[in-house]
Amino acid sequence: METEGRRREVVVSSLQFACSDDISTNVAAAERLVREAHAKGANIILIQELFEGYYFCQAQREDFFKRAKPYKNHPTIARMQKLAKELGVVIPVSFFEEANTAHYNSIAIIDADGTDLGIYRKSHIPDGPGYQEKFYFNPGDTGFKVFQTKFAKIGVAICWDQWFPEAARAMVLQGAEILFYPTAIGSEPQDQGLDSRDHWRRVMQGHAGANVVPLVASNRIGKEIIETEHGPSQITFYGTSFIAGPTGEIVAEADDKSEAVLVAQFDLDMIKSKRQSWGVFRDRRPDLYKVLLTMDGNL
């Protein structure tokens, strides 16, 4: 049953571009693409994970901690606040946060009037060849959050978080109407023949379909080489950013090499009606899910 006489439409956008290791160049590129998305009618615009520079987590280097900045008065966040206010758009802004002795992979949510609605700190921190984030980041302490923006209540999580269905469900249970996942993912340095892009996309398509919400994923492109004590480490980021609809269908997608500005429009009231009528939240049995609070399945 569709909502009688009501339409609450929102246009979302996913950006995709290659990063250099120069902050000013990358932030300028992000601003240029935000403006392009706005020109296409976008209301909420997602920039990829840690877009200020190279994905430095390929290597464990002490000097890379200098890239972290405090959340308060962060220059890139401040610039994006001005841009959001000028254009009247919502912009989640990914950054490497320094908080006293802690460091986080964080994202600030900027509303359409330039207001900073707060931050989410990445909860799931990966640790593997080429993705050595545990060296740099503390586990996030914010928990999964939703943010009431001008256009929608949104849930935002970061990269490795996207592989966990519990994160998506937690955000939608709190009222998230759209899920956003900024990402930095590509080839595996230890196995250049391993290509996870289809798996990556299908996992998130499942989150969209299981929760009956649209989902926006933004990834970078290009080859990045980081010098390590054992020689250069290289990742080719595979892009393929996409927007999924509430049944998990892909409604907009980028390729693996090109800069892109994806847009898609959704009627949130119609989706809410379908989510309610489908029954996946009505028929939940939280009393049976206590096993999810364990690491090994033993209660």
UniProtKB/Swiss-Prot annotation:
Where in the numbering of this chain does the CN hydrolase domain appear?
A: 10-268
The protein's matches in PROSITE patterns, at most eight in alphabetical order, are given as:
CN_HYDROLASE (PS50263)
- CDD domains in the record, alphabetically? CPA (cd07573)
Its EC number(s) = 3.5.1.53
Q: Which SUPFAM superfamilies match?
A: Carbon-nitrogen hydrolase
Gene3D superfamilies (alphabetical): Carbon-nitrogen hydrolase
Name residues in a coiled coil: none
Query: Which domain of life does the UniProt lineage start with?
Result: Eukaryota
Give the pH dependence.
Answer: Optimum pH is 8-9.
Pfam families reported in the protein's UniProt record: CN_hydrolase
**UniProt key word Hydrolase:** yes
Q: Name one GO molecular function term.
A: N-carbamoylputrescine amidase activity
Q: Which family does it belong to?
A: Belongs to the carbon-nitrogen hydrolase superfamily.
What the entry lists under NCBIfam families is as follows: agmatine_aguB
Question: What does the record note on quaternary structure?
Answer: Homooctamer (isoform 2).
The record's listing under PANTHER family reads: BETA-UREIDOPROPIONASE, NITRILASE C965.09-RELATED
Role description: Involved in polyamine biosynthesis. Catalyzes the hydrolysis of N-carbamoylputrescine to produce putrescine and ammonia.
Q: What is this protein called?
A: N-carbamoylputrescine amidase
